[in-house]
């Protein structure tokens, strides 16, 4: 679990804080090394994480108290699921585990961001 926290921190810190809107998704498979793939996935995940947080904040500010509480609880459970699910992929053998964990974080984060954006 500690390694997933480190991965999440790397993903968050690797994004440019100046990116207001995400660029079109890069094809991370075009990278030349595992490290470049992992960095690409981290960059893309950070972009989607920013979108997710903006959508969450927008929803929280517009919902009545009862629905805010439900969204807060759902989001906390979603974070637990994401962390546990991606920790499974991170626990694999070799450097491919880093790629699989990065793909997991990108896939789940982008899906959740789109889900919340659709509700705003």
State the predicted function of each range.
Residues 18-120:
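N-terminal alpha-helical modules
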Residues 6-16:
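Bacterial N-terminal signal peptides
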Residues 1-5:
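Positively charged n-region of N-terminal signal peptides that target proteins for export
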């Amino acid at each position: 679990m500690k390694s997933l926290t480190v991965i999440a921190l790397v993903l968050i810190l690797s994004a440019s804080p100046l990116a207001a809107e995400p660029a079109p998704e890069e094809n991370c498979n075009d990278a030349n090394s595992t490290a470049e793939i992992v960095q690409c996935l981290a960059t893309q995940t950070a972009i989607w994480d920013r979108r997710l947080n903006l959508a969450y904040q927008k929803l929280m500010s517009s919902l009545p108290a009862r629905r805010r509480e439900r969204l807060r609880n759902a989001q906390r459970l979603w974070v637990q699921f994401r962390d546990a699910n991606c920790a499974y992929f991170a626990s694999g053998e070799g450097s491919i585990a880093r790629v699989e964990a990065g793909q997991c974080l990108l896939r789940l984060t982008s899906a959740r961001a789109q889900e919340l954006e659709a509700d705003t």
